[in-house]
Amino acid sequence: LTLSEAGAKVVVLERGPWYTVRQFTHDEVGICRRDFFVPYPYAGYDPKTIRKKGEKKAHRTTEGWIGVCVGGGTVHMSGFFYRFKESDLRLKSMTGGLKDADLADWPIAMDDLLPYYDLMEARVGVSGQAGINPFETRKRPFPLPPLKTHPAAKLLDQAAGSLGFHSFPTPRAITSRSYGKRPPCNYCGYCGDYGCENGSKSSTLASLIPAAEATGRCQIKPDCMARRVLVDKDDRVRGVEYIDSRGEVQKIEARVVVLAASAIESARLLLLSKTGRFPQGLGNRSGLLGKNLTFSTFGKATAIFDRGELEAKLGKGGMDLP
C-alpha cells in the first residue's frame, strides 16, 4: 500500500487463492480438518515437518500453519494486536547474554517504532483501551474503543483480581464500530482460525489490499507461487521466477523485490535462490539463513464453566477472550 501510494508499480505474488467475504462460513470441519486455508499437512503434497534436534528424524505436524491465501495469516488470525515492549528490543543487554544463545539488541529504540505502530493501527482499525496495561508502550489512544467483554472474560477478570493479578482487555484488530466502509463486529464468535464474513476483522484482505488496489498501481496475482529470486551477472536482484495458476513457470522483472512470505517461507525462498556468489542461498554468507527465526507464538487453555450467564450469545471466539 505504501509503495503504490508513493507512485511505485507493485505486483503481489500469492501462492493461494483470493477469497471473498461470501466464502467465509462457520464450517468447523472445513477449517479444522480440510485444507480451506492451508494444504492439509497429511495430504502428501505440501507436508509440514518438525524435529527438535538436527540429528532427529522429522515428523509431520499440524502446528505452525499459516494462511495460504490473499491476506495470508491475517485472514484467520484472532486479531490480538500487542506491541513489543522495550525489553523485547534489549534482550541481550537485559540478560547479559546467555550461553549458546544468539541474542542481539535491536539497532533501534521503541521511540523509533511508536509512530509506525500508531500508523498501522489507524490504517487497519484496532480496538482497545489505552492506559490500562501497565506495560504498554503507547502515547495515543486506540483508533477504536474496546470491544464488548465476553461473560467468561468477566469471570476470569474476577478470578485474576482475587489472586492479585491485573487483567486488562486485549487490543484487537477488529472494528468495535463502523470504520471507513467496514461494519462493526457482530460478535458471532468465529474469529480465530476463521475468515470474517462480516468484514470486521482487520485482515490485510479487508483493510490494506482494497486501498492498495484503489491506487491503480497494485496488481494482486493469486495462485502464483514464487520459486526463486532472480539475479543478474553481478548478483543484483532483478526479479522473481514463479509458477502460475496453470502450473507454468513464469518470470517477472522488478527493480526491488520484497519478501513477505513469513519467517519460514521467506528463508526457504532465499535458500532456493543460490548463485555463484551465494552458493548457500541468496545473502547467506554467514550460514545463518533460516536459523534464529522469530515467530508469532501463542498459548491456549480450555476451561469448563457451569454458569448460566455464559449461555448469553456474546463472543469473539471461544479461545479469543480479551
Where are these regions (language model features)?
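Glycine-rich loop(s) and the adjacent beta-strand/alpha-helix scaffold that form part
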Residues: E5-V29, T215, C224, R228-V231, ...
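N-terminal FAD cofactor-binding segment of flavoenzymes
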Residues: A6-A8, R15-R83, M110-L119, K154-G161
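FAD cofactor-binding and catalytic pocket of flavoenzymes
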Residues: K52-G54, A58-I66, V70-G73, M77, ...
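Structural recognition of the beta-strand scaffold that forms the well-ordered cores
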Residues: V12, H76-M77, P169, L259
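Short, solvent-exposed loop/turn and secondary-structure capping segments
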Residues: V21-T25, G73, S78-F80, D88-L89, ...
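Conserved redox-cofactor binding core of oxidoreductases
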Residues: F36, T49-T62, S93-A226
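A short, glycine/Asx- and small/polar-enriched loop/turn
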Residues: R182-C185, V231-R238
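Rossmann-fold NAD(P)-dependent oxidoreductase module
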Residues: T2
